[in-house]
């Protein structure tokens, strides 16, 4: 495909695969996976990744923020106040305003607390941030986030780190159909076919971390994910055949001996 870019908050990207920066053996492996994935955006947990302590290994020594768009996230935050404070620190440290917001409800499921998420979204927008928001696969709540100023909606495919794949494709499709901002599947992808399905549903992109980082060969899996995302997008643009209850022969018999 010649030009099939997508845009969020005025930023344009060619790659529809966003890669995380956690759970890798080391920063070198993380950097190799990011390169193999062809990613342009990497998401960074502000509370867990070293971005400022020069006496210790730093992510920026391996993944150059001048070459990649760093997307600070609020992983580990369980209320709006924590999340907003974390992103204020990120802006002070690196000037970032395009951010990924996630406010978790509990440690067992890491399911989003949508009341706190909406509250944090409203605060961040007022403070000049451009939040891409992790959320439940609820079309009504997704619309409320968009109305509150979210620049992208990021419904989960399944619980974070579960690798269960897309559990509710119907709701994801409803979110896509109603949205006027990009929709990205965030969380739950386990293998390449999951990523392909996300794009086949019409999602603009997909974000993943564990599916690559915990693969037996993370760099090879990153390559697989890149191909899957591209294939899924092409299939969506091509338009799949309709589903039928009964068979329809590929080779008609009319006119044959």
UniProtKB/Swiss-Prot annotation:
Example GO BP: thiamine diphosphate biosynthetic process
Active site residues of this protein: 100 (schiff-base intermediate with dxp)
Gene Ontology CC terms, in alphabetical order: cytoplasm
Binding site for 1-deoxy-D-xylulose 5-phosphate: 161, 187-188, 209-210
Catalysed reactions, as listed in the record: [ThiS sulfur-carrier protein]-C-terminal-Gly-aminoethanethioate + 2-iminoacetate + 1-deoxy-D-xylulose 5-phosphate = [ThiS sulfur-carrier protein]-C-terminal Gly-Gly + 2-[(2R,5Z)-2-carboxy-4-methylthiazol-5(2H)-ylidene]ethyl phosphate + 2 H2O + H(+)
Molecular function per GO: thiazole synthase activity
Keywords linked to the UniProt accession: Cytoplasm, Schiff base, Thiamine biosynthesis, Transferase
Record carries keyword Transferase: yes
Subcellular localization(s) per the UniProt record: Cytoplasm
SUPFAM superfamilies assigned to the protein according to its UniProt record, in alphabetical order: ThiG-like
Broad class of enzyme this protein falls into: transferase
Pathway stated in the Swiss-Prot or TrEMBL entry: Cofactor biosynthesis; thiamine diphosphate biosynthesis
InterPro entries attached to this UniProt entry: Aldolase_TIM (IPR013785), Thiazole_synthase_ThiG (IPR033983), ThiG (IPR008867)
Entry EC number(s): 2.8.1.10
Task performed by this protein: Catalyzes the rearrangement of 1-deoxy-D-xylulose 5-phosphate (DXP) to produce the thiazole phosphate moiety of thiamine. Sulfur is provided by the thiocarboxylate moiety of the carrier protein ThiS. In vitro, sulfur can be provided by H(2)S.
Family under the similarity heading: Belongs to the ThiG family.
Binding partners and assembly: Homotetramer. Forms heterodimers with either ThiH or ThiS.
Name this polypeptide is given: Thiazole synthase
Gene name of the record: thiG
């Amino acid at each position: 495909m010649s030009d099939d870019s997508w845009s969020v908050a005025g930023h344009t990207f060619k790659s529809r695969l966003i890669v995380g920066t956690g759970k890798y053996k080391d920063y070198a492996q993380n950097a190799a996976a990011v390169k193999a994935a062809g990613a342009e955006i990497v998401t960074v947990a502000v509370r867990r990744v070293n971005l400022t302590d020069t006496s210790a290994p730093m992510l920026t020594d391996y993944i150059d923020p001048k070459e990649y768009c760093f997307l600070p996230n609020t992983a580990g935050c369980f209320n709006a106040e924590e999340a907003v404070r974390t992103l204020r620190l990120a802006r002070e440290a690196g000037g970032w305003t395009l951010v990924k917001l996630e406010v978790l409800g509990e440690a067992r499921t890491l399911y989003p607390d949508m009341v706190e998420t909406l509250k944090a979204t409203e605060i961040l927008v007022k403070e000049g941030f451009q939040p891409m928001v992790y959320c439940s696969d609820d079309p009504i709540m997704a619309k409320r986030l968009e109305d509150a100023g979210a620049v992208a909606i990021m419904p989960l495919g399944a619980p974070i780190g579960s690798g269960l794949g897309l559990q509710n494709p119907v709701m994801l499709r409803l979110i896509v159909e109603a949205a006027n901002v990009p929709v990205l599947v965030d969380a739950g992808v386990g293998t390449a076919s999951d990523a392909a399905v996300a794009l086949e549903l019409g999602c603009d992109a997909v974000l993943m971390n564990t599916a690559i980082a915990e693969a037996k060969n993370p760099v090879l899996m990153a390559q697989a994910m890149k191909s899957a995302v591209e294939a899924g997008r092409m299939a969506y643009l091509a338009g799949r055949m309709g589903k039928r209850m009964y068979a329809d022969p590929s080779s008609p018999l009319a006119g044959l001996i």
